[in-house]
């Protein structure tokens, strides 16, 4: 356990150093299957927010750190950092449909955002996910991701994305993931994200 804690701390320090000058939007970056009970997960995902209306695209980093509470429930902390924007949150995911080759889950959580220059917000996150495994070690997943935000001393807005992605098992404790978030309204920005998730197996 001490070794696991040291690895987690090292990963957290690396993430902090990597994004110290970058300021995020949440990413899905997991299939409908929850983290195995008792296992820890650390995922780090370089992410690009695609520019809109001729604007420049922006690179940043997203991360997820989670724990499998039961065979069907996990909890994950989330963070993301882009220029001028920092995002921190957490959610609980429930794996409610376990089929032979089809799974579905739902997640509910919340977040806060810190915008440089004002406009800080907080909100509720909701996601619905489904996944299937066409071949060994490869999962195809898709999700609907919604965020309902309230701006401090301001109004409300909603972020909405359809998210197709892949999760490939490199080894028992390492997954490669890639996804695209397709914006569904004017408040949202489409994004692309890719990275690795490491599992600290119990």
Where are these regions (language model features)?
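Transmembrane beta-barrel domains of bacterial outer-membrane proteins
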Residues: 62-81, 87-93
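Generic N-terminal leader/processing signal
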Residues: 1-2, 39, 76, 177
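A short, polar/proline- and glycine-enriched secondary-structure boundary/capping micro-motif
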Residues: 86-90, 187-190
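Cleavable N-terminal export/targeting peptides
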Residues: 1-34
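Short, surface-exposed coil-to-beta transition loops
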Residues: 59-62, 86-89, 124-125, 161
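Outer-membrane beta-barrel transmembrane domain signature
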Residues: 26-35, 39-56, 67-68, 96, ...
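Enrichment for repetitive, rod-forming helical segments
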Residues: 9-11, 71, 176
């Amino acid at each position: 356990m001490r070794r696991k804690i040291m690895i987690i701390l090292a990963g957290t320090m690396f993430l902090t150093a990597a994004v110290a000058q970058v300021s995020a939007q949440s990413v899905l970056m997991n299939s409908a299957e929850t983290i195995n009970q008792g296992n820890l997960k650390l995922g780090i995902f370089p992410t690009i927010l695609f520019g809109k209306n001729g604007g420049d695209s922006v690179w940043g980093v997203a991360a997820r750190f989670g724990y499998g509470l039961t065979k069907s429930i996990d909890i994950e902390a989330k963070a993301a950092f882009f220029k001028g924007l920092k995002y921190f949150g957490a959610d609980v995911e429930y794996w409610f449909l376990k089929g032979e080759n089809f799974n579905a889950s739902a997640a509910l959580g919340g977040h806060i955002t810190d915008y440089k220059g004002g406009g800080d917000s907080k909100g509720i996150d909701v996601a619905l996910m489904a996944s299937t495994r066409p071949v060994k070690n490869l999962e195809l997943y898709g999700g609907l991701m919604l965020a309902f935000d309230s701006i401090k001393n301001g109004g409300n807005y909603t972020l909405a994305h359809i998210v197709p992605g892949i999760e490939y098992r490199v080894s028992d404790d390492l997954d490669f993931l890639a996804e695209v978030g397709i914006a569904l309204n004017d408040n949202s920005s489409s994004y692309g994200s890719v990275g690795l998730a490491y599992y600290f197996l119990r």
